[in-house]
Amino acid sequence: GMRVIPLIIAEEKLDAAKAAAGEEPLLELRPWVRKTAAIVATGSEVKKGLIQDTFTPVVRDKLAAYGIETLSVTYPGDGVENVANAVAEARQTGAEVILCTGGMSVDPDDNTPGGIKQSGARIVTYGAPVLPGAMFLLGYYDDGTPVMGLPGCVMYAGATIFDLVLPWVAADVPVTRDWIVSLGEGGLCLGCKPCHWPACPFGK
């Protein structure tokens, strides 16, 4: 509603305001739904133990902030088949959100997008007009389970495309390609130090 300033106002003006507002509410609050997640940490170096997995702890913490419990973490290495099989196994755990880390760039051995597609997901977008996070992937399975391919920036940047999408996923609101495209306005993080997100223009 809106406060009417004058003591008296013509009724037709109130009727016009109601008509302009329409039947739908101007704002809708959707609660976060307690969910479970599975993380597929790709990359042969991580699987072989040549480098430490510093990506998973970051993702796990971001999920926990929304009450999302991580059920499993797997290390399939590289290769489209390996990633696809790992995603299929992650789905079998009953996880309601699937997250793949690493292998999202354009290098020849970056096979995560292909693995996600081969696993049967309907790809909503591979790429986003957002920095950090341009190489983000989002898809859905037929049962509504979301799957995301997270670019490396999620590991070290204060706020990324993942931080913009995750609240919607946590509230069970389907994320569309049109909405991802709309993030192009306000989609450049200025990298402020210290980071004040979400109290900043990023993603708004």
Predicted regions located by residue number:
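Short, glycine/charged-enriched hinge/interface segments at domain edges or termini
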Residues: 1-71, 75
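Short glycine/threonine-rich loop/turn motifs
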Residues: 44, 50, 54, 68-203
